[in-house]
Regions:
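Short N-terminal edge-element motif at the start of the domain
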Residues: 1-36
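Extracellular structured ligand-interaction cores
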Residues: 8-10, 26-30, 45-47, 178-183, ...
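Polyanion-binding and phosphate-handling cores
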Residues: 25-28, 33, 47, 52-58
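Exposed low-complexity, polar/acidic, P/S/T/G-rich flexible segments that act as propeptides
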Residues: 28-29, 194-216
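Acidic carboxylate motifs that coordinate Ca2+ or other divalent cations, activating on Asp/Glu
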Residues: 40
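Low-complexity, serine/threonine/proline-enriched polar segments
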Residues: 53-156
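Extended, compositionally biased non-globular segments
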Residues: 141-177
Length: 216
């Protein structure tokens, strides 16, 4: 378990975000935490979102749903969402597998639920380069104010964000007072793609209890 420490951050999550003169690469992931109330060691209690800079503002959608459908081999993966939008996760040259649809899902469609942020990606009309721009704070794989010391400024390796258990909220945005947390999950916070770079997809490499490592 990780308990609130009273320090700046309680735990850290490693991504690979970086900033550059053209905007860099930021693929924000929303963090959810759970306390094992029933003590059975399973993530079957209530999940609570950690608030970030986009919580409660115009453009952020709670209770968001997106359904993906199994494609033909080497085909784009189609989706529809709860806002009436549709699109696809496109095959690209960087990933050569036959399917981008998860191998462990036997059904021909599956639905994800969570919170969606407004995308901040854009293409430079002169150079053609795509930029995935950063959010202020509160997200994994993102060069916000909660970015911790370390990380390669060229490719983002070793980049980490710090998080506070005290930022857990109920659905209506009011704070949750958790004694400790036992489970953490990360959901990609944006449904968008940046041209030839492909879809915006949060990368997660490790989780770190800062009360043990003191690596802030």
């Amino acid at each position: 378990s990780i308990a609130p420490s009273g320090r700046e951050y309680d735990f850290a999550i490693q991504g690979n975000a970086f900033n550059s003169s053209s905007g860099g690469s930021n693929e924000p992931g929303i963090v959810w935490v759970m306390q094992d109330i029933n003590g059975n060691g399973q993530p079957d209690d209530e999940w609570y979102e950690l608030k970030g800079s986009e919580t409660g503002i115009d453009g952020t959608i709670q209770d968001y749903e997106v359904t993906y459908y199994r494609p033909a081999p080497r085909a784009h993966t189609p989706w529809v969402d709860s806002e009436g939008n549709s699109g696809s996760v496109d095959m690209n040259a960087y990933h050569g597998q036959e399917y981008y649809y998860p191998n462990w899902i036997k059904e021909d469609s599956y639905t994800l639920y969570g919170t969606r942020l407004t995308p901040r990606n854009n293409q430079d009309p002169v150079t053609g380069y795509w930029a995935n721009n950063a959010y202020e704070w509160g997200y994994v794989d993102n060069m916000g104010s909660d970015n911790l010391v370390g990380g390669n400024v060229i490719d983002g390796s070793g980049q980490r964000n710090g998080f506070k258990i005290a930022n857990a909220i109920y659905h209506d945005g009011t704070p949750v007072k958790l004694q400790y947390i036992d489970f953490i999950k990360v959901q990609c916070g944006v449904l968008s793609k940046s041209g030839w770079l492909g879809e915006i997809s949060t990368e997660v490499f490790s989780f770190e209890d800062l009360s043990i490592t003191n690596n802030q």
